[in-house]
Amino acid sequence: TLTTALTVGILKEAFGEIVTNPSGANMITGITSTFLTAKKAKSGKKIAVLEIDEASLPKITEYITPSLFVFTNIFRDQMDRYGEIYTTYQMILDGAAKAPEATILANGDSPLFNSKEVVNPVRFYGFDTEKHDPELAHYNTEGIVCPKCESILQYRLNTYANLGDYVCLNCDFHRPE
């Protein structure tokens, strides 16, 4: 919700009216209502910035074709909705695959978003930090295993939960540059 609000604020200054769902109505009925109640743009062009529920994305991308997806994070505290984080990520990928021309802007600090080949073009963002020696993350960190060899990932810097400058010491999997 914060990422959506910040993005809308920036784009509104540059382009005027933006279609968005600030109330958090992020499932198909809420997205539909957002478009039905949107003001008509003076330029005739509409820019939409939408926060979309993970499981709703495959349904929504049957009806709209985004030009950009932004993947920020998936944490284990979201498991009560759709089970394991890998299941949630697969739902997101299934939705993105229905718009294969759309670029995915993914948080490179999340090992999950760097774990699978996708049909979409991908760009990564993340913190540029000093390099430290890899070490096991704090016991409170959400343990993520290497998607290539299933070893426990280590972190040169752990910023929050499973995010940071990760590396697998058993194979070549690491945070994208």
What are these regions (language model features)?
Residues 121-177:
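Adenine nucleotide phosphate-binding catalytic loops in nucleotide-utilizing enzymes
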Residues 1-124, 134-141, 145-146:
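Phosphate-binding loop of NTP-binding sites
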